[in-house]
Swiss-Prot record:
GO CC, alphabetical: A band; cytoskeleton; myofibril; myosin filament; sarcomere
Biased composition, class Basic and acidic residues, residue ranges: 94-105
Function: Thick filament-associated protein located in the crossbridge region of vertebrate striated muscle a bands. In vitro it binds MHC, F-actin and native thin filaments, and modifies the activity of actin-activated myosin ATPase. It may modulate muscle contraction or may play a more structural role.
One Pfam family in the UniProt entry: I-set
Protein name as catalogued: Myosin-binding protein C, cardiac-type
Protein species of origin: Mus musculus
Gene (UniProt): Mybpc3
Residue positions where Phosphoserine is found in the record: 47, 72, 273, 282, 302, 307, 423, 455, 546
Length: 1270
C-alpha cells in the first residue's frame, strides 16, 4: 500500500479524458504509459473491450488508443483503461447533431468553425465541466480551456493562444500544482526557439509569479503591454523541477489598429487564412478570396477593444510612487511611460519618511550569511518581549522540527535557529516571524573545491580499440568537465563519448578510437584539473617469429609456427596458394599470438609452399616443406658406412635454432653390416695440425689442414639431449634449446669395412639482452633527448632497432613512443606535459623478437624556460649608474623563477657584459660603475632550472650622464597650515622633493640649525622626514627646510604648535551674595596650553554632601552669577578652564562656603524621642511541603521579616547547603527562595530555613519528595 498522506504513483504519463461527440462521428481516447511494453486493458461498464468493427484498439510503444467508430447514443457510458494497478475512468457523451444555421450556410467549406478569443477573455470566461473536450465531426478533439484537476505533466492550466491589436495589452497565465513539489518550480518563457524573455523584461514585457498557500498552486504570468507587430509569433513556456520537466507552446497574433476612417469594408470581407499556412493579414485584392463574415466580426470586436481608441483614465503617477516601496519605483515608472525618472525619484528619496522602528526585534538577522558545505550555522535574533513566540520560515514555508537537522533554542530574549550539516539544499532565504513583523536573511552555502585525488593516465591504442580514461575526485557526486585540446566535450556528443560516474570515480569512454581522437584530454573540477595524452596509431602487425622451411621424412611430423604482435588477429593457411582445409591429419591452432600448422604422417604429396595470411593485413608468411625420400639401392654386402646429407663434406651449412625451440637432427646412414653411430660435441679448441685428406672428400687446396678439438661423447637415450639410432638413420634431439647447446657436433659411423664422419654446426639464437638504463639530456618544455647503449648480448642476431616507452612517475602504465624501429642510439621524445615527472625505458629488437625492458631512467621533468620579462624601463640615470625596473614574465611555467640576469652592451656592439655576477630575485636593479657618456643597451632575462628565457631589451640606447633637474619641494596640503600636536604624541612630517643630482637637505628652527637627540632627520633620494618621538612644548616653533643643488635651492616653512591642557583659573572670589544668588569672579589661567581658551566650567557643591554639580559649561566670560540656590545651605564653588586638548587637571575653588540665610526667621528644629525599630525574625509565610518530579528544577519559597536584616541559612537534613553549588539561594524584599537544580531522589528530605539577627532567631521547615517519572 502507498504511504499515508502520499499520492500513489500512476502508471500513466497521459490519461484519457471525457469526451462529447455528435452522433455518427468517431471518438478517440489516448493514453500514454510510463514505459513501453505494458499490458493495457480497455473496459466499458466493467467489461473488457476487444477489437471489432465498433471498437478499434491500437498500441505503439508507450501510446495506446481506443477508437469508437460511428458513435450512437447506445455508446454513451463510463469507460476505463487499466495498466498494472492503475485504473483511469472517463465518460463518453453522444449528442444529436445541431441544425445548420443560416449564417454558417453562407460560409465556404474549410472556414473555421469558431474564432479564437484573446487570452485575456479566455481567463475571464467560465470553464465548462471538468475534463470535458469538444470533438469535431472528423474525430479530432480540441482541449477545453479550463484546467483539469488531474494535470498532464506539471501544468494545471496551460497558456492559450491569444490575439491583440497593436498598442493593446495581453496576459498569458500558467498554473502549476505545488502540493507534490519539494522545491518551487522554475519557469522560463521563450519566444521563438531560443530567445529567453527574462533578458527582455522592461517597459513592454514583464514576468510575474505568485503562490497561493491555501490551494498550493503557483501562478506564473507573462504581461505584454503596448504590443507591436514584432510581438507576434510563437511562444513557449517551460517549467522544471528537480526531476520533472514540461513545456507548452502557444501563439500570439497582433492585428493592426483600425481607425474609424481606415476600415476597408471590402478587405474585411476577404478571408485572410490560407490552407496549409499560418494566419497572415493582407490588404491587396490579388490575395483576396471568398467573403468571410467571421473575419469582419472579429475586426469589429478588436476595433471595439482597441485600447488606443478609448480615452485612458487619468492616473496620478506621483501618488502611486509615494505609496509604493522603493524597489518598485523603476517598474512603475516604466509601466506609466516615465523614462526620465531620475530626478523625480531623487526628489522622492529626499522626502522625509517616517521609518517604522521595529517593536518586536531588538537585534535582527544580518542581511546575509555564508557557510561551508557540511558545516553548521547559527541564525540568532533578539526580541523585545522574552515571552514572544517566533516562527522560522525557509523560502516562505515554515521549518518543522526534524531530527537533528534544525535545532531551535530560546535563551531569554534570544531566539536561535541552528542548521547542522549544511548542504546545497539549505541555500535559501530564511525569515524569522514574530506576530506581524519579520526579518529576513539569505544563506549562501559554499562548496569546498573538488580535488582530483588520482590523475588521468596517458594511453596508446590502435585504431578501433576501446579507450577509457579514469580519474578519482575527493567527493561523491561532484560535477566534472571533460575537455579535449581545451574544448569541452558536451552531452550532445554521446554517440562518440560516454561519461560514467561510479562514486568518486569518473570515466570517459571512447568505444572505437579513430585517428581524430588523438590529443590531450583533461578533466576539470572546481579545485584543479588533470591532463593526459591519447595517441592513436594505425594497426600495424609485427611478426615476432616467421615460419621456416622444413625438411622431413616420410611418416614424420611437420610443424609450421609463427608469432605475431596482435593476439586477436586471425589468419588463413594456404598450400600452393589455395586455402588449406584442416582434417584428422592436418591441424590448425591459434593460441594467443602463436599460429601453428601441424601435419602428421608426412607424405610426398605434402611437399609444397605453405603460407600464412593474417586477416585484415596485406602481408603473408611463406615457407617450403621438403620431403626427404629414402632411396634404397642394392649394394653388396660388406658395404662401408655412409652418412647421407644434403651438404656432405667438411664444411656443412650452419643449423640455426631459436632458444626454447626443439632441435632435431635426423641423419640418414647406410652400411653393411649396420654401422655404429657416435655423436660428439666440441668442448675446447686445440692446436692447429696437418691432416690427411678424407678418402671420400673432394680434392681441395685448402683442405690439407684442420683444427683439432676436445670432444664430449653424447650417448644418452633419454632426457633433454638424447640420441636415437635405428638401422637406417640416427636422430639427435635437443628439447628446449639453450645457449650452451651451441657448437660443432660430429657424427661418426663405423663398421668393419670403414667409417664416415660429418661435422654439423649448431647456432642457438635468442632475443637480445635488456639494454642499460637510458640517459636523459636536453630536457625542454615538452621534449627531451633519450640516449642508450646497445645490449651486451645481441642474441646471436644483429639488433634491428629499438622501441622506446615512457610513463608518468606516479603512474603504472607504460606508453609506447614508436612503432617503427629506431635505428639510432638516441631519440628526441616530444609531446610531453610540462611540470609532470616522467621515466623512460628501451627495448632491443632482433630477428628473434624483443628483449626484456631496460631499467627505467632517472625521473625527469620537462620544464621550459620562462618567457621574457615585461615593461622594462629606465627609472633613473646618473654619471656612472643606471637604475632599471621591470615586471615578471607573463609565462613563468612549472619551473618557477630562480632569478633575473641583467646585461648591457655598447651601441652597435654585439658583446653583452653581465651587470652582476649570478642572479637577482628583485625586479629592479642599480647598475653601477658605467662609463660616463656611453650609450648603452640593457637587456634582462628570466632564469629557471631549464635555463634562461628570452631577453627584453631597452627600446633605445641609454646615455650614461647625469640629468640636471632643478630642486623643488612638494609640500603636502596638510602641512601648509599650522601643524598642531598634543604633548606626548609623535611627530612625523614627510616632505617629498625633486632634483638631480641628489639635492642637499637642510632643516632649521627659528633660523638656527636643529640640535638635540629628540629631533631626528631622515633623508632619502626622494623625500625628507622630520621625526619627534614624543612632542614637548619646547618643540613648538617655525621650521624651515631647504633643498639645494649647487646655486639652485627651494625652501618651505612649517609651523609646529605643540598644545597641552591649560592651568586652572586664578584668583576666584565671591563678589556678592543676595537672595538665592551668588556672584563669582576669576582671572584667566596663567598657562593657556599654547592654544586658545575655549571656555570655563562652573560647578557648585552643597556643604553637607560635597557632591559637585555643573552650573555653567563652555562659559567664555570670567565672571558669572549662580542662581536658584537653596536657602539655609552652604555652598562651595570651583571653576575649570578648557581648550582644544581638554579641561584643566585642577580647578580653582572657593576656600570658605557661602551660606544662604533665610531673611528674618530663625529655624529651630523640633526634638523627638528616638524610636527603636529593632525586631526579632519571624516568618510571615512558612515553607510548604512539596512533591516534585526528578530532573526538573524545583523552588522552595517563604517570607521573613526582622530588623536589622536577618542572616538566612538553609539546611537539608541538618546539613548546611551554603557550600553546595547545586542549590541557589535568593533574598528579595524579605522573600526567600531556594532553587534546586535538576533534583534526584537523593535530594528528598527535610529542608529548614533559619533566620538570625541580634534580636533572636526563627526557623521553618518542610518536607520535599522527589518522584521518578514513570
Amino acid at each position: 500500500m502507498p504511504e499515508p498522506g502520499k499520492k500513489p504513483v500512476s502508471a500513466f504519463n497521459k490519461k484519457p479524458r471525457s469526451a462529447e461527440v455528435t452522433a455518427g462521428s468517431a471518438a478517440v481516447f489516448e493514453a500514454e504509459t510510463e514505459r513501453s511494453g505494458v499490458m493495457v486493458r480497455w473496459q466499458r461498464d466493467g467489461s473488457d473491450i476487444t477489437a471489432n468493427d465498433k471498437y478499434g484498439l491500437a498500441a505503439e510503444g508507450k501510446r495506446h488508443t481506443l477508437t469508437v467508430r460511428d458513435a450512437s447514443p447506445d455508446d454513451q457510458g463510463s469507460y476505463a483503461v487499466i495498466a498494472g494497478s492503475s485504473k483511469v475512468k472517463f465518460d463518453l457523451k453522444v449528442t444529436e447533431p445541431a441544425p445548420p444555421e443560416k449564417a454558417e450556410s453562407e460560409v465556404a467549406p474549410g472556414a473555421p468553425e469558431e474564432v479564437p478569443a484573446p487570452a485575456t477573455e479566455l481567463e475571464e470566461s467560465v470553464s465548462s465541466p471538468e475534463g470535458s473536450v469538444s470533438v469535431t465531426q472528423d474525430g479530432s478533439a480540441a482541449e477545453h480551456q479550463g484546467a483539469p484537476d488531474d494535470p498532464i505533466g506539471l501544468f494545471l492550466m496551460r497558456p492559450q493562444d491569444g490575439e491583440v491589436t497593436v498598442g493593446g495589452s495581453i496576459v498569458f497565465s500558467a498554473r502549476v500544482a505545488g502540493a507534490s513539489l519539494l522545491k518551487p518550480p522554475v519557469v522560463k518563457w521563450f519566444k521563438g526557439k531560443w530567445v529567453d524573455l527574462s533578458s527582455k523584461v522592461g517597459q513592454h514585457l514583464q514576468l510575474h509569479d505568485s503562490y497561493d498557500r491555501a490551494s498550493k498552486v503557483y501562478l506564473f504570468e507573462l504581461h505584454i503591454t503596448d504590443a507591436q507587430t514584432t510581438s507576434a509569433g510563437g511562444y513557449r513556456c517551460e517549467v522544471s523541477t528537480k526531476d520533472k520537466f514540461d513545456s507548452c507552446n502557444f501563439n500570439l497574433t497582433v492585428h493592426e489598429a483600425i481607425g474609424s476612417g481606415d476600415l476597408d469594408l471590402r478587405s474585411a470581407f476577404r478571408r485572410t487564412s490560407l490552407a496549409g499556412a499560418g494566419r497572415r493579414t493582407s490588404d491587396s485584392h490579388e490575395d483576396a478570396g471568398t467573403p468571410d463574415f467571421s473575419s469582419l466580426l472579429k475586426k469589429r470586436d478588436s476595433f471595439r477593444r482597441d485600447s488606443k481608441l478609448e480615452a485612458p483614465a487619468e492616473e496620478d503617477v506621483w501618488e502611486i510612487l509615494r505609496q509604493a516601496p522603493p524597489s518598485e519605483y523603476e517598474r512603475i515608472a516604466f509601466q506609466h511611460g516615465v523614462e526620465a525618472c531620475h530626478r523625480p525619484l531623487k526628489r522622492l528619496k529626499g522626502m522625509k519618511q517616517d521609518e517604522k522602528k521595529s517593536t518586536a526585534f531588538q537585534k535582527k538577522l544580518e542581511p546575509a550569511y555564508q557557510v561551508n558545505k557540511g558545516h553548521k550555522i547559527r541564525l540568532t535574533v533578539e526580541l523585545a518581549d522574552p515571552d514572544a513566540e517566533v516562527k522560522w520560515l525557509k523560502n516562505g514555508q515554515e521549518i518543522q522540527m526534524s531530527g537533528s537537522k534544525y535545532i531551535f533554542e530560546s535563551v531569554g530574549a534570544k531566539r536561535t535557529l541552528t542548521i547542522s550539516q549544511c548542504s546545497l539544499a539549505d541555500d535559501a532565504a530564511y525569515q524569522c516571524v514574530v506576530g506581524g513583523e519579520k526579518c529576513s536573511t539569505e544563506l549562501f552555502v559554499k562548496e569546498p573545491p573538488v580535488l582530483i585525488t588520482r590523475s588521468l593516465e596517458d594511453q596508446l591504442v590502435m585504431v578501433g580499440q576501446r579507450v577509457e580514461f579514469e580519474c578519482e575526485v575527493s567527493e561523491e557526486g561532484a560535477q566534472v568537465k571533460w575537455l579535449k585540446d581545451g574544448v569541452e566535450l558536451t552531452r550532445e556528443e554521446t554517440f562518440k563519448y560516454r561519461f560514467k560516474k561510479d562514486g568518486r570515480k569518473h570515466h570517459l569512454i571512447i568505444n572505437e578510437a579513430t585517428l581524430e581522437d588523438a590529443g590531450h584530454y583533461a578533466v576539470r573540477t572546481s579545485g584543479g584539473q588533470s591532463l593526459a595524452e591519447l595517441i592513436v596509431q594505425e594497426k600495424k602487425l609485427e611478426v615476432y617469429q616467421s615460419i621456416a622451411d622444413l625438411a622431413v621424412g616420410a611418416k614424420d611430423q611437420a610443424v609450421f609456427k609463427c608469432e605475431v604482435s596482435d593476439e586477436n588477429v586471425r589468419g588463413v593457411w594456404l598450400k600452393n596458394g589455395k586455402e588449406l582445409v584442416p582434417d584428422n591429419r592436418i591441424k590448425v591452432s591459434h593460441i594467443g599470438r602463436v599460429h601453428k600448422l601441424t601435419i602428421d604422417d608426412v607424405t610426398p604429396a605434402d611437399e609444397a609452399d605453405y603460407s600464412f595470411v593474417p586477416e585484415g593485413f596485406a602481408c603473408n608468411l611463406s615457407a617450403k616443406l621438403h620431403f626427404m625420400e629414402v632411396k634404397i639401392d642394392f649394394v653388396p654386402r660388406q658395404e662401408p658406412p655412409k652418412i647421407h646429407l644434403d651438404c656432405p663434406g667438411s664444411t656443412p651449412d650452419t643449423i640455426v635454432v631459436v632458444t626454447g625451440n626443439k632441435l632435431r637432427l635426423d641423419v640418414p646412414i647406410s652400411g653393411d653390416p649396420a654401422p655404429t653411430v657416435v655423436w660428439q660435441k666440441t668442448v675446447t679448441q686445440g692446436k692447429k695440425a696437418s691432416a690427411g685428406p678424407h678418402p671420400d672428400a673432394p680434392e681441395d687446396a685448402g683442405a690439407d689442414e684442420e683444427w683439432v678439438f676436445d670432444k664430449k661423447l653424447l650417448c644418452e637415450t633419454e632426457g633433454r639431449v638424447r640420441v636415437e639410432t635405428t638401422k637406417d638413420r640416427s636422430v639427435f634431439t635437443v628439447e628446449g634449446a639453450e645457449k650452451e647447446d651451441e657448437g660443432v657436433y660430429t657424427v661418426t659411423v663405423k663398421n668393419p669395412v670403414g667409417e664416415d664422419q660429418v661435422n654439423l654446426t649448431v647456432k642457438v639464437i635468442d632475443v637480445p639482452d635488456a639494454p642499460a638504463a637510458p640517459k636523459i639530456s636536453n630536457v625542454g618544455e615538452d621534449s627531451c633527448t633519450v640516449q642508450w647503449e646497445p645490449p651486451a648480448y645481441d642474441g646471436g642476431q644483429p639488433v634491428l632497432g629499438y622501441i622506446l616507452e615512457r610513463k608518468k612517475k606516479k603512474s603504472y602504465r607504460w606508453m609506447r613512443l614508436n612503432f617503427d624501429l629506431l635505428r639510432e642510439l638516441s631519440h628526441e621524445a616530444r609531446r610531453m606535459i610540462e611540470g609532470v615527472a616522467y621515466e623512460m625505458r628501451v627495448y632491443a629488437v632482433n630477428a628473434v623478437g624483443m628483449s626484456r625492458p631496460s631499467p627505467a631512467s632517472q625521473p625527469f621533468m620537462p620544464i621550459g624556460p620562462p618567457g621574457e620579462p615585461t615593461h622594462l624601463a629606465v627609472e633613473d640615470v646618473s654619471d656612472t649608474t643606471v637604475s632599471l625596473k621591470w615586471r615578471p614574465p607573463e609565462r613563468v611555467g612549472a619551473g618557477g623563477l630562480d632569478g633575473y640576469s641583467v646585461e648591457y652592451c655598447q651601441e652597435g656592439c654585439s658583446e653583452w657584459t653581465p651587470a652582476l655576477q649570478g642572479l637577482t630575485e628583485r625586479r629592479s636593479m642599480l647598475v653601477k660603475d658605467l662609463p660616463t657618456g656611453a650609450r648603452l643597451l640593457f637587456r634582462v632575462r628570466a632564469h629557471n632550472v631549464a635555463g634562461p628565457g628570452g631577453p627584453i631589451v631597452t627600446k633605445e640606447p641609454v646615455t650614461v650622464q647625469e640629468i640636471l633637474q632643478r630642486p623643488r619641494l612638494q609640500l603636502p596640503r596638510h602641512l601648509r597650515q599650522t601643524i598642531q600636536k598634543k604633548v606626548g604624541e609623535p611627530v612625523n612630517l614627510l616632505i617629498p622633493f625633486q632634483g638631480k643630482p641628489r639635492p642637499q637637505v637642510t632643516w632649521t628652527k627659528e633660523g638656527q640649525p636643529l640640535a638635540g637627540e629628540e629631533v631626528s632627520i631622515r633623508n632619502s633620494p626622494t623625500d625628507t622626514i622630520l621625526f619627534i618621538r614624543a612632542a614637548r612644548r619646547t618643540h613648538s616653533g617655525t621650521y624651515q627646510v631647504t633643498v639645494r643643488i649647487e646655486n639652485m635651492e627651494d625652501k618651505a616653512t612649517l609651523i609646529l604648535q605643540i598644545v597641552d591642557k591649560p592651568s586652572p583659573p586664578q584668583d576666584i572670589r565671591i563678589v556678592e551674595t543676595w537672595g538665592f544668588n551668588v556672584a563669582l569672579e576669576w582671572k584667566p589661567p596663567q598657562d593657556d596650553g599654547n592654544t586658545e581658551i575655549w571656555g570655563y566650567t562652573v560647578q557648585k557643591a552643597d556643604k553637607k554632601t560635597m557632591e559637585w554639580f555643573t552650573v555653567l559649561e563652555h562659559y567664555r566670560r570670567t565672571h558669572c552669577v549662580v542662581s536658584e540656590l537653596i536657602i539655609g545651605n552652604g555652598y562651595y564653588f570651583r571653576v575649570f578652564s578648557h581648550n582644544m586638548v581638554g579641561s584643566s587637571d585642577k580647578a580653582a575653588a572657593t576656600k570658605e562656603p557661602v551660606f544662604i540665610p533665610r531673611p528674618g526667621i530663625t529655624y529651630e528644629p523640633p526634638k523627638y524621642k528616638a524610636l527603636d525599630f529593632s525586631e526579632a525574625p519571624s516568618f510571615t509565610q512558612p515553607l510548604a511541603n512539596r512533591s516534585i518530579i526528578a530532573g526538573y528544577n524545583a523552588i522552595l519559597c517563604c517570607a521573613v521579616r526582622g530588623s536589622p536584616k536577618p542572616k538566612i541559612s538553609w539546611f537539608k537534613n541538618g546539613l548546611d547547603l551554603g557550600e553546595d553549588a547545586r542549590f541557589r539561594m535568593f533574598c528579595k524584599q524579605g522573600v526567600l527562595t531556594l532553587e534546586i537544580r535538576k533534583p534526584c531522589p537523593y535530594d528528598g528530605g527535610v529542608y529548614v530555613c533559619r533566620a538570625t539577627n541580634l534580636q533572636g532567631e526563627a526557623q521553618c521547615e518542610c518536607r520535599l519528595e522527589v518522584r521518578v517519572p514513570q
